[in-house]
Structure formats: structure tokens, C-alpha cells
């Protein structure tokens, strides 16, 4: 079962990403110490789409690499 949007947002926030706004069901997250950006779309209780899961994983990896 895919993770919920709420879980992806929690992962981003625990990794140092901050919500920089958005419109409607779209939320933009920027890492506080790097230039990594990711947009999360969907309602909090929705299942995350495969492409969104991949985008979040890439953003988390990029933020780790830029901080090292």
C-alpha cells in the first residue's frame, strides 16, 4: 500500500524541508540549508502517486548530498 501524502510531508519536514506555500492542494517545500525544492500535490489523506514518491526520495537524497 502506498504511503499517504501526510506521511511524505512528515518525511520532508523531519529532513529539514519547510513549507513555502502553494495553491489549492499543491504545497511547495524547500530545504532550509540547500537549494532543493519539491512540490507535493494531493489531499493529506490521499495515497501518494508513484511519481510523487520518487520525487520526494530524490529531493531527500539531493538535500543529503548538498549538506555533505
Language model feature labels by segment:
Residues 1-21, 30-68:
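Basic nucleic-acid-binding interfaces
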Amino acid at each position: 500500500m502506498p504511503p499517504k501524502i501526510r506521511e511524505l510531508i512528515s518525511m520532508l519536514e523531519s529532513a529539514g524541508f519547510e513549507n513555502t506555500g502553494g495553491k489549492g492542494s499543491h504545497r511547495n517545500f524547500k530545504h532550509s540549508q540547500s537549494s532543493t525544492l519539491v512540490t507535493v500535490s494531493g489531499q493529506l489523506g490521499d495515497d501518494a502517486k508513484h511519481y510523487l514518491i520518487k520525487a520526494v526520495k530524490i529531493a531527500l537524497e539531493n538535500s543529503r548530498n548538498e549538506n555533505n
